């Protein structure tokens, strides 16, 4: 009982940090559009988005699919999402992804999307296996994670990250669960340079920016995104597209 109460308190604290970060990151609509451009050509049919937040990426790929099952643990964010997306195309569900995913037992998605989610799970193999079970045969996983394991530090720990990924480790994680790698590319190399200077701060990255600075970053994103196309640069994030083998 004591452990369950402790887990509940930790979940409440994590929810608060997560919700606050979502509020700040809402000042970066260009960032969410940038993320969506990295994978939207792979979207089709039924999409399962894990850790959807308030749907700030979802809104960009929604026209390309038939239905989205949008999953989050935070009820306030889900209410915001449900209010934004009417018409029955978005099925908002509350689930703690640290559990058995029983709330998603009926889901067989064509595409599963997990953006900055996998790194929050100590047992990432278990996470990928549960994700795999929610995919239809031949389904696709779209994954975005923090990149460069050498950058892991106090800021990651404060953000609830168990690790950062290198290309080889993310590829191996999915391939040992029966996926093939269609694409795996860095994103936001300029952001990685800035993160390196702040990685030892004991706080969430978004808290190191004032609202005014976030608005400036948002305005600069069309230029920052151009660096993704330059070879040989490591990004702040990795974006992978993995196909489930038949």
Predicted regions and their residues:
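Active-site-adjacent helix/loop segment of glycosyltransferases
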Residues: 188-203
